[in-house]
């Protein structure tokens, strides 16, 4: 890494003093929050050079072009893929995309910005005036859902409101395309600089300061993550640095705002907002003033890092090496047509006829990239073979509980190994490759048609996940024969053994004193056969054996 002594002084040029404000304390001030969200785009190359994007495990300073390092004579060349992804985000967020957009230089001096300026968009951003809708299921925790739904069902209640009315629209002021900076790491008196991240493509999404609770701010970020993953613009991961969030907090509509930088997750976003609000209220309550500042957050409290610079300090100027970009209506239509079905529409489809997925499962399918499309295909294949309502409920159970559950357990195991080796393994999954939808539908139908019991199907599913070659080459019928999973003749031996071991129970069933006790006998046979045999088959065989006693 590049090494810079901490003794080196890097001083920002201050040309304007921010005015402080004092607030009346007769009533508790309103919390006002705005968000600035930086999201890395899923491109193969950097924003203004042909360098391929690095991974988390890439050796420091090995993915750096001459332009990334700001060597004299190098010039930027826009990556069109980054522009298209930024347009997808802007359209999905219902923004007005500008016909003309341009790049500016934002000047400041810092070790991880070798050019002395960042290429961003200040005067002519890519898009403005968007919005993101937060529905009731976005705004309320799952623990609150039962009470909300019960209240909604109680039409006699005077204060009952349609759940749809609980949604809010968060305005988006602008979306701009810009380059990322390098990464600084501090060790004692030295600063280590890794330029791999320099010139990575970002979009900055700026909301209006209209959010009034910390939980709503976190809900906005979660919803945005889901949307960007759904349309293939970004992974939205905090862990890998693909998303970084700054929050602006003030008290009262005219309050001076303080910016909290680079919060690492949604829990920290909530906690930092609440801590900063309490700090400002306490400060004003003691007769102090809130000054425009950049804040840090240590997990419990916020603290002042530096006085906030005004925009004039950055000395914005048009980038003379990048031309204006003119976007045609045809280009925007093509981008719009390339968008997949957006999360809110997918949710509405999942919870309606013929799927009737629960709210909880619908959100799981939406939040996990690629999983809702996978579910739809499994459902369609099952529904082609049967209209049985019970069978049609099985695809969501298998996709959410069995497939996703086992994939997540495998991820946790790999993450633990990666933590030990220092090489994190992050990223989305291709569920079609892990377990093809046709194969899962075949397994579900085998249970429905009594070829397999549910425990046997789960065992077979687990085997196929661990042995992809068997999954690829073996049919369900072959697997039933190979692993002796069918309703084989050993049911006779198992039934006879259970009857001999539980004579008193058998007697109570036969004489009619306790006919329900046959369920106990069925359970014992299922235990003896490891759940491989259908309970109905076991019951028939038990009754046959008892008749011949």
Curated annotation (Swiss-Prot):
Q: Where in the cell is it found?
A: Mitochondrion
For this record, the Gene Ontology CC terms, alphabetical, are: glutamyl-tRNA(Gln) amidotransferase complex; mitochondrion
What are the TM regions of this chain, as residue ranges? none
Which residues does the annotated transit peptide occupy?
1-23
Q: Which PROSITE patterns does the record match to this protein?
A: GATB (PS01234)
Q: Which reaction does it catalyse?
A: L-glutamyl-tRNA(Gln) + L-glutamine + ATP + H2O = L-glutaminyl-tRNA(Gln) + L-glutamate + ADP + phosphate + H(+)
Alphabetized, the UniProt keywords read: ATP-binding, Ligase, Mitochondrion, Nucleotide-binding, Protein biosynthesis, Transit peptide
Q: Name one GO molecular function term.
A: ATP binding
Q: Does the keyword ATP-binding apply?
A: yes
**What biological-process GO terms show up in the record?**
glutaminyl-tRNAGln biosynthesis via transamidation; mitochondrial translation
Name the Enzyme Commission number(s) assigned to this protein: 6.3.5.-
NAD keyword on record: no
Write out the similarity annotation: Belongs to the GatB/GatE family. GatB subfamily.
Instruction: Outline the subunit composition.
Output: Subunit of the heterotrimeric GatFAB amidotransferase (AdT) complex, composed of A, B and F subunits.
Q: Which HAMAP family match?
A: GatB
- Write out the function statement from the record: Allows the formation of correctly charged Gln-tRNA(Gln) through the transamidation of misacylated Glu-tRNA(Gln) in the mitochondria. The reaction takes place in the presence of glutamine and ATP through an activated gamma-phospho-Glu-tRNA(Gln).
Query: What PANTHER family does the database record attribute to this sequence?
Result: GLUTAMYL-TRNA GLN AMIDOTRANSFERASE SUBUNIT B MITOCHONDRIAL AND PROKARYOTIC PET112-RELATED, GLUTAMYL-TRNA(GLN) AMIDOTRANSFERASE SUBUNIT B, MITOCHONDRIAL
This chain belongs to which protein, by name? Glutamyl-tRNA(Gln) amidotransferase subunit B, mitochondrial
